[in-house]
Amino acid sequence: MVTYRGATYPWECDQIGHMNITWYTSKFDQANWNLFAAVGITPSYLREGNFGVAGVQQNITYKRELMAGDVIEVRSRILEIREKVIRFLHEMMTAETQEIAATCEITAVHLDRRTRKSCPFPEAVRNAAEAQVG
């Protein structure tokens, strides 16, 4: 599923002329929230339930440069859902050629913000995520 669409702006580029790694992370983070919303982890769910999601591991692989003016999209999929853990993959690509510029695999834990400890995902979230594993 497409979880982010945007462009590479000149101010996001470094002295070498390509998008700086800071911006890859930022765009992947925006994709996180769209992916979460698709399985029921919405802003209201997080606020009203006093829940959170914390990344515990993030691996980014850079495959090709993105330059100012490149239109990009991120496609995401869930790799695994467990009682308290979700693992997913983002692929950032140029919208024009569909060439993958970077991938980001993240493992995250569901949190109870009151106790500051991990807690199980609700059944509805687990079921929605399981339906999208692929």
Which residues make up each language-model segment?
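Terminal targeting signals and extreme-terminal segments of soluble enzymes
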Residues: M1-E73, L79-G134
